[in-house]
Amino acid sequence: VGLLAITSADRLNAGWTAAQRAREYGSPQAVSHVERLLADVPSWCALVTVIDGHPATLAWLGSVVGHRTRSLGVEHFGQTGTIADLYAHFGIDARGIVAAAQAIVPGRPIRHASFL
């Protein structure tokens, strides 16, 4: 299991887009920060992205190196409740994250998930 905390999806995506554009215009050595971060993650690994915002914000990460991706986030706005209740509703609590990880890699049990 790997964990990547992204503080600015916008800047990370802008760097990736700039590197792609540079390669298209003849700079094959251009590599973005996110490409360096994900370069050592085997292609058979899957990514689960989680954001307290729209899931499309991080869904592009699977395209960087070609990983299967399950993006979790808030798809409908206007609900009220406690943070814990809302996170559970949208599947961005611990139980939802583990369920998404289990679903994207079927047959590979997640150890120590019984605490949920």
Please place each PLM-identified region on the residue numbering.
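Thiamine diphosphate
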Residues: V1-L116
